[in-house]
Every structure is written in structure tokens, then in C-alpha cells.
């Protein structure tokens, strides 16, 4: 098993995902999603941004490395009666099985930023975005005062730099 996948499958991250739903909704409201757009939510968790995008009429695919989060997202979409959304387990570093230029919009809020190889993620995001499409990310920032940002800052001091 991919070590990053093993990490994200160790705990119940739906509680953290629930805490980010307001941020996910706010992002979706600001990025101009329209009916029929093809949208990829990368590091989708339990559907934090994917579900609001689907409610606007977009055709949404959510990808997350964690099988439990993919199951939770699928269940939330079913409970909401959304049929224009699907979720799949996958690695943001390569997006195997997703064709080139498949999406009008690729978005990730508090998801892709955790991938161990950020340059691979960036390449994959560009590859699956249509020419003229958009990539939108919501990430914690270096001077963010939140507890999570402080934990990440401390962890970074003891972590090797990402490989290119």
C-alpha cells in the first residue's frame, strides 16, 4: 500500500472534513462553477467542495487517496440525491486512469497540499485540465495562525524536502 494512503486510512478524517465544509462552500461560491462544467475535486475528502459544486449542476469527479473518505463522500452524495457526481480512490501525484484535458476546472481545498510530491501533483493537475481551463486551490498559508498550520510548520522542520 502507498505510504501516503496508509497514513490517510489510519483514522477517521471525516471529522476534520466536516470542519472544513464552510471553507469548501465559500470556495465553490467564488469560483464561478456553472451547470454542465466538468469539475475535478482533488483530495476531495468526504465531498467538502465536490458536493456544493454538484449542487450547482457541474459534472463532478472527486478523487481521494483514502478509501474510507471516498466511501463517506459517496454516501453523502447518495443521501443528497446527487446523480451528477462520482468519487474514486486515486493518488493526486499521478491521477492514473483520468484522461488528459478531461476537466474545465480542477480544484482542491486542503487536499492536494498534503501530497508528498507537490511537483507531480501540479503536473497531473495541468495534464487533466482542458486548455483554457482553471486550477483553483485553497491551502493553509505560512503565517496562518490556526493550530493545524502551526503543527505543519513544526513538522516541516523535521521533514526532508520534497523530491522533484
Residue ranges, per PLM feature:
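Helix-to-beta-strand junctions that scaffold the AdoMet/dcAdoMet cofactor pocket
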Residues: 115-116, 129-131
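A short acidic, Gly/Pro-enriched loop at the edge of an enzyme's catalytic core
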Residues: 93-106
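Class I SAM-dependent methyltransferase SAM/SAH-binding core
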Residues: 38-95, 120
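A short SAM/SAH-binding and catalytic strip from SAM-dependent methyltransferases
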Residues: 104-119, 141
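Conserved class I S-adenosyl-L-methionine
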Residues: 1-37, 48, 72, 152
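Conserved catalytic/acceptor-binding region of the Class I
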Residues: 119-120, 126, 134-164
